[in-house]
């Protein structure tokens, strides 16, 4: 089975930038997958198809995390390593790992302070509408969830991109990261 690294974090944390940098290295037997590549439906469509909980961390995100994990399992079974990025709740990741019997996944939260996030969203990405209190609260929520789950956190506001890429490549190639265990079965 290939190595599996998931990077999560709020908008502006550097997930796509870092994942693209890893992708550009063209590591042998390694695929990079982007959560948003499946397309993000409108709020109305999410509400219609998945009910309440269409906001970040809601029912749609959970359903897509489970769906993606099924795809990834088949790739890992072929001996190919996978880097997966997206704004994913750790609770959903853990549930999906359990459902798909994937052990040894490396989960990394990419995070930065609110000022850095705002600067990136406004200046670098030209999406100032995302630099709002809801996004800052979402990033804080993911940070707290990562701390509680003892997930590795990389501060992309302080670390150079090259260092973040190095850490992720190390996880993909040598397993040098903390592993998130599947959710324990209730007895």
Where do the PLM segments sit?
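Walker A/P-loop
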Residues: 16
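Conserved phosphate-donor/acceptor-positioning beta-strand/loop module used by diverse small-molecule
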Residues: 86, 101-123
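Conserved substrate/cofactor phosphate-moiety recognition/catalytic segment
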Residues: 20-69
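Glycine-rich phosphate-binding loop used to anchor ATP phosphates in small-molecule kinases
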Residues: 59-102
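Hydrophobic anchor at the beta1->P-loop junction of P-loop NTPases
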Residues: 7
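Small-molecule kinase domains that catalyze NTP-dependent phosphoryl transfer to phosphate-bearing small molecules
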Residues: 127-167
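P-loop (Walker A) phosphate-binding loop of NTP-binding proteins
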Residues: 10
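ATP-binding Walker
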Residues: 13
